[in-house]
């Protein structure tokens, strides 16, 4: 069965599979679409909490996005955890350069398992 559409997911990886890029892939697939990804961070977490977050360098995130858009393309983009301002700027510039449409921004501000603030509102507004 041919997928209905292609969705680029830009988000962090949740080792427990309950959120982040893993949950987005499950959702996109369940809706009959094809998921591609750009990983922005890797987490060590479970249902009890987030123990560690490692940011993927913004240059790598940008390269993941361009590799997908140059070859596979996308009908929509879903953005989750970006984790730092360099990544936010890089994702914004890359999607703007490719004139990406149908962009859904679902930012992660606080992990539900713990009180972990990724970015403050003033930081986001400066981008």
Could you describe each region identified by the protein language model?
Residues 1-76:
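Small-residue (G/A/S/T)-rich helix-start motifs and N-terminal tracts that mark the onset
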Residues 36, 93, 122-123:
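Intrinsically disordered/low-complexity terminal segments and short unstructured peptides
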Residues 79, 83-119:
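Conserved beta-alpha-beta core of the PfkB/ribokinase-like small-molecule kinase fold
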Residues 118-127:
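Single conserved hydrophobic/aromatic residue that forms the stacking wall/gate
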């Amino acid at each position: 069965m041919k997928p209905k559409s292609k969705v680029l997911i830009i988000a962090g990886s949740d080792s427990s599979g309950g959120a982040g890029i893993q949950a987005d892939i499950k959702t996109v697939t369940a809706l009959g679409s094809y998921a591609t990804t750009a990983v922005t961070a890797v987490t060590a977490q479970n249902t009890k909490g987030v123990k560690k977050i490692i940011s993927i360098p913004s240059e790598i995130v940008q390269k993941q996005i361009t590799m997908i858009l140059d070859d596979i393309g996308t009908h929509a983009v879903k953005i989750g955890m970006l984790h730092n301002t360099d990544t936010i700027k890089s994702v914004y510039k890359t999607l703007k350069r490719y004139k990406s449409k149908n962009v859904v921004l679902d930012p992660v501000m606080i992990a539900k398992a713990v009180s972990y603030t990724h970015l403050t509102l003033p930081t986001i507004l400066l981008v």
